[in-house]
C-alpha cells in the first residue's frame, strides 16, 4: 500500500511538469537532474524537455520495499492532456488523464492565480539562477495540498508540498543542462 501511495504522489509531482500543450518554459530545451524526498523515500529524477516544454518526459529512480531495498524505475511521458507512466521494471504502462492542469508560470492569468490562491512571496537563487518563489493551493478529490515552488523561466527548480500539516514532497534541481540536444 505504501508503494502505491508513494507512486501516486510521485506521479502527481511529475504531472506538475508534464502538461505539454502550450509553451511553458523560457528556454527551448533542458535536462534537469533532481533529488526528492517523498514520504521519507529518496527519489532521483531526471526531467527532459524540448520545444519550450511542449515535449516532456521524466525518469524516476527510487528504492522501495523496506529491508529488501528494491530499486524502482519509472518513466513518464506527456501526451497532451494525458500522461503515460511506464514501470520499467514490471514492463507495464498506464495512461491517465491529468487530474488538474499544472500551472503555467510563464502565462499566469488572474483566473489561475485566484483558483490556486497563488501568491508571489519573494525571490531566491537556486543553482545560480534567480527564482521567483510562489505559494499555492491545489484541491483535488476533496484534498487540499499546499506548495511552495521556486520558478526560473517557468521551470520549477524547487518544490515543497504538504497536506494535512505534513510535508509529503520536497524536490530540488541539482543540475541543469540548458539547450540540451
What are these regions (language model features)?
Residues 22-181:
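Extended soluble regions of mature proteins
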